[in-house]
């Protein structure tokens, strides 16, 4: 009998990881949603408690991070205003290896590469198809545009629908290029 999945884990073929990194993603997605539930017998007497999940508190899109091929930039970034985008040379504000390793707690990002990303069941159903399509993002003035790849476009579409993408700086995976970085 088919049982629906709770999550989809996206892994690029050049990502190096161990199973502990997977469990860290699950923990990031569900830790704030853990609740203790009472278990009652047929007479209504509490006989034990069990750990459950409050689905409304589950983080829907969570990611670890990895360095990109330059060894300096990471897979997660923050959307910039038009003015800041121009000042930054037409490049979004990616976390660097240096900046992300100083962080100690999960934080929100505007987008993440899909090399190591966990997505809760129901996210795709709330987004318009096609879910992964490069798109031209147009800034408010209409004068500046940025062609976004499919993973960036997915995250920005999810954000428009009220979903939040989380990154845990403690979940670093390897990225095998000409060397593992």
Which role does the model predict for each range below?
Residues 12-16:
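The conserved acidic donor/metal-binding loop of glycosyltransferases
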Residues 8:
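Short aromatic/hydrophobic "clamp" motif used to bind/position activated sugar donors
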Residues 108, 133, 138-175, 180-181:
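Catalytic donor-sugar/metal-binding loop of nucleotide-sugar-dependent glycosyltransferases
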Residues 1-5:
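Conserved small/polar residues in nucleotide/adenosyl-binding loops
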Residues 18-137:
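Conserved catalytic core of nucleotide-sugar-dependent glycosyltransferases
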